[in-house]
Amino acid sequence: MGKALIIAEKPSVASDIAKALGGFVKKDDFFESPQYVLSSAVGHLLELCLPEGVEVKRGKWTFAHLPVIPPHFDLQPIEKNAARLNVLLRAIKRKDVDRLINACDAGREGELIFRYIVQHAKAKQPIQRLWLQSMTPTAIQIGRAHV
């Protein structure tokens, strides 16, 4: 059995998870244990492409065509966070990562941050949710038990 990649929304949350679950070794931009690889975003890493940035093959548009609701929204990396995105993309593509665990904040923005990363990476692994009500070690351990 491979490892699960846990993606938190921010580095402080990843650090709290590593401490609460124990057994992690800090590498450059992530933590690793026999069961898990643990890393984080730093808030939003990707954003929707503006219409003029959309690929031409999807067709040109003008304001006369509005409203336009495309079947697919293209994403682009946010420049200042590109290095962190690359860390996560490499982790997702690791051969030993066989599932992804969303440990981003439980609200809409946290879910969106995680889903954009998964979409951009074209990840095929199954996804699980680490739902954390608080950041206490006990709450994190309970959350892991219910993934």
Predicted stretch roles:
Residues M1-R144:
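Intrinsically disordered, low-complexity regulatory segments
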